[in-house]
Amino acid sequence: MPKATLVSPPFVDAHFHLDATLSLGTPRLNRSGTLIEGIALWGELKPLLTHEAVLERALRYCDLAVSQGLLAIRSHVDICDDRLLAVEALLEVKRKVAPYLHLELVAFPQDGYFRSPTAATNLERALDRGVEVVGGIPHFERTMADGAASVRALCEIAAARGLRVDLHCDETDDPLSRHIETLVCEAQRLGLNGRVAGSHLTSMHSMDNYYVSKLLPLMAEAGVAAIPNPLINIVLQGRHDTYPKRRGMTRVPELRGAGIPVAFGQDCCMDPWYSLGSADMLDVAHMALHVGQLTSREAMRFCYDAITVNPARIMGLEHYGLDVGCHADLVVLQAKDPIEAIRLRATRLFVVRRGEVIAETPERVAALSIEGRPPKVDPAAYAPRES
């Protein structure tokens, strides 16, 4: 065992798309790198999906996730397929991985709740079959008015069923895309406080500062959480810019300063939208730290919380953490502390679920053959004295 180790609660990903994961190149690659081409590609892929293929890819991804210490995932699943093929496949995945990974599913109308003719019916069917969170994509509706109406309808469904809400909200560079304010209003109106999240919120990056100063207190009052997806936001946003080119990720320091719960999601891994990814939430935090300029020691520790305790709270995970009485779920990392874990994207030495080691990785130590220098290099040994 290395001298520098950190015992951490497991990583939690509050925003992912398990139905599309590991499908890179099928039926073709995203040449433009844009969100819109990614959605079009997914539309081409959907008719080709089989239950077995979705199941196999999702289970392979869960294997990778566990090896990285990622033991809880909230995955959106597209319901704009009348077969509900991906829904059925991921419900089976949920049952299969339950002994070692918590999987929560969001009914996601990828093609628009109103824009897709059967989305409303399919969403209810998915919820009836056991999908437990209501999703949406208001900025993809045909008009701003339809987008706002979809937010109201989806929140009413969640309130009637006693479910949580997690909408893809304002994933655009358009500063006038303000569906988050409708989401906040509906959370207050329907008593959904603490059960609602807005994912992405990239338009906030471009909004007028005065408007944001009004919006943030309303989000805090309604208990609406924010789930940026740093790896994807920095890649997909700003595609219509020349220079200067916007970073796209929402205003994380300001959200945090307003007392709004913030968690970072990975969103994609080797799929129509993103050709990279490795199920490594430390990679997500590392990108968020850079894009959001979250470089104070306190802010870097917050970035670690945004991939552990914060998403666990947003998802309502019970018995999560290292306190007495919690599940014995933990990760042992080859790092001195959370900041070093992010800096190094530290090796996950042991992953423990309910007290049993379910994954382990040898410590990362390089052997040197340089005269007069030490024979081995442990990257974790380079930590500053105070971090």
Where are these regions (language model features)?
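Active-site-proximal loop/turn and secondary-structure-junction residues that shape catalytic pockets
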Residues: 79-81, 109-113, 140-142, 171-175, ...
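His/Asp/Glu-enriched, well-ordered alpha-helical/loop segment
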Residues: 164, 185-196, 229-236, 246-333, ...
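Active-site mouth loops of central-metabolism enzymes
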Residues: 41-56, 106-118, 138-145
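Alpha-helical scaffold segments that flank or form the walls of functional sites
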Residues: 6-7, 24-76, 84-96, 121-128
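Di-metal (Zn2+ and/or Mg2+/Mn2+) metal-binding site signature of metallo-dependent hydrolases
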Residues: 5-27, 172-173
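Histidine/acidic residue-rich metal-binding segments in metalloenzymes
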Residues: 85-99, 116-225, 241-264, 320
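Active-site gating loops and adjacent loop-to-helix segments of metal-dependent hydrolytic enzymes
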Residues: 21-54, 130-133, 179-197, 220-225, ...
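Active-site microenvironment of metallo-dependent hydrolases
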Residues: 301-387
